[in-house]
Amino acid sequence: MARRSQGTKLHLAVLCLVVSCHAIGLSDLMERASQRSDKLHSLSTSLNKDLDSHFPPMGRVMMPRPSMCHTSSLQIPKDKEQALRVSENELISLARSLLLAWNDPLLLLSSEAPTLPHPSNGDISSKIRELQDYSKSLGDGLDILVNKMGPSSQYISLIPFKGGDLGNDKTSRLINFHFLMSCFRRDSHKIDSFLKVLRCRATKMRPETC
């Protein structure tokens, strides 16, 4: 019931945003998107801490490198200094491309979480579903933003996800689950950073304060 209530609140928030989008200024829309991306990153950080609490001793050694994340092929700014030099249209495109690239991986994580060999798999499963809700909410909000910004901001890079299996043994499942979550945490941080830069520009804040 709590899960349904949370999802309903999020979707109602999106509906309200859709209905009133034409009356809301760009800076307010950016602020709302930034709040959602902040929550998304906060949840992913919490999930990584949960997974760290019960991780195989050799997990860090065996876990794939960050360069193996399926979104690593996307050319993005490496830090805030670079992001501040990127246009608004490109930043919103990058944020949407990264978010879209996680639809299938989040489905996989959601299906695997309930039987994950981890003592907190119930909490992990619940948080994964929250991630899906916030991801959809943020995606809907960004769709509204690009419609307000114009056609030049609507380009999306499609990033394929080929990993449909976490493995058969307990160690492989934990490591691959943790790896995917670490990739998501990294990308959620990028999405949040890009949207905060856009919010700063929309509110005409000084770039160095973004």
Curated annotation (Swiss-Prot):
Coiled coil: none annotated. Keywords: Disulfide bond, Hormone, Secreted, Signal. InterPro entries: 4_helix_cytokine-like_core (IPR009079), Somatotropin/Prolactin (IPR001400), Somatotropin_CS (IPR018116). It comes from Oncorhynchus tshawytscha (Chinook salmon). Disulfide bonds join C69-C183, C200-C210. Residues 1-23 form the signal peptide. PANTHER family: PROLACTIN, SOMATOTROPIN,PROLACTIN. GO terms for biological process: cell surface receptor signaling pathway via JAK-STAT; negative regulation of gene expression; positive regulation of gene expression; positive regulation of leukocyte proliferation; positive regulation of phagocytosis; positive regulation of reactive oxygen species biosynthetic process; positive regulation of receptor signaling pathway via JAK-STAT; positive regulation of respiratory burst. Belongs to the somatotropin/prolactin family. GO terms for cellular component: extracellular space. It is found in: Secreted. Its main location: secreted. The gene is prl2. Pfam families: Hormone_1. This is Prolactin-2. One of its GO terms (molecular function) is superoxide-generating NADPH oxidase activator activity.
